[in-house]
């Protein structure tokens, strides 16, 4: 099967140097899902266009013309440019830490190359919202993303009715089954009390701007992030541990 040219958007997940001037880039594309591309000549001197390598930083959203052959594991990019030019994510240490957490979480969930345009648009929109977010929204953003991403992988906890849980007394979220109840699960994989109540509140957040109203302290966010990592490990095969999580826990004070 010969290669054909296609125009697609993509989110950069990983970039690895190759040879003297090239990179191999893992990109989640709108048209083809998870793909790897060889990009030549982007690491030469700045005078010769070396700055092009900056376009392939993790979380970058690109507009591309790509060669595609479904039988090849490594294709090539003919043209590329930023689809959205970030104002803060690539330069602000805290927003960059959140973005890298989101990139790693998505990468760990993607096991097959199949396209999912809804997942692509959800993720791209999330990065753009993060770039524009206030400090409070940014601090809660990893929790929001971690709870809403699972809808695309079949294990998201259902939205509880607003006000369904008036207090946190004896409230549990079963991380294995993904359900809330007032009965303690018969296994150790659950969160309870305020953690379960706040999780229910976060699940009802439909627009990131609503995160402004959820006031949490640094330690509580860290506890929830740890619990959500366990949640993913229970549902995603070979999930392992998040390398970006320790950095994120320290930065989001």
Regions found by a protein language model. Name each.
Residues 1-253:
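Non-catalytic alpha-helical scaffolds and adjoining flexible linkers that form interface surfaces
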């Amino acid at each position: 099967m010969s290669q054909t040219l296609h125009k697609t958007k993509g989110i950069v997940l990983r970039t690895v140097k190759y040879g003297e001037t090239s990179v191999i880039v893992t990109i989640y594309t709108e048209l083809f899902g998870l793909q790897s591309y060889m990009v030549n000549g982007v690491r030469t001197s700045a005078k010769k266009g070396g700055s092009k390598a900056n376009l392939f930083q993790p979380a970058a959203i690109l507009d591309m013309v790509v060669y595609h052959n479904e039988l090849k594991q490594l294709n090539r990019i003919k043209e590329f440019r930023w689809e959205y030019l970030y104002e803060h994510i690539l330069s602000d240490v805290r927003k960059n830490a959140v973005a890298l957490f989101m990139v790693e979480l998505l990468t760990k969930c993607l096991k097959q190359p199949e396209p999912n345009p809804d997942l692509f648009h959800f993720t791209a929109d999330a990065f753009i919202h993060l770039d524009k977010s206030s400090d409070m929204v940014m601090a809660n953003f990893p929790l929001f993303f971690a709870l809403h991403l699972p809808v695309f992988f079949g294990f998201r906890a259902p939205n509880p009715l607003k006000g369904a849980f008036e207090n946190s007394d004896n409230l549990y979220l079963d991380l294995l089954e993904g359900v809330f109840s007032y009965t303690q699960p018969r296994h150790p994989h659950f969160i309870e009390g305020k953690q379960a109540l706040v999780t229910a509140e976060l699940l009802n957040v439909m627009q990131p701007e609503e995160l402004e109203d959820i006031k949490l302290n640094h330690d509580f966010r860290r506890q929830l992030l740890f619990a959500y990592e366990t949640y993913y490990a229970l549902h995603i095969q070979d999930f392992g541990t998040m390398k970006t999580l320790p950095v994120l826990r320290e930065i989001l004070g």
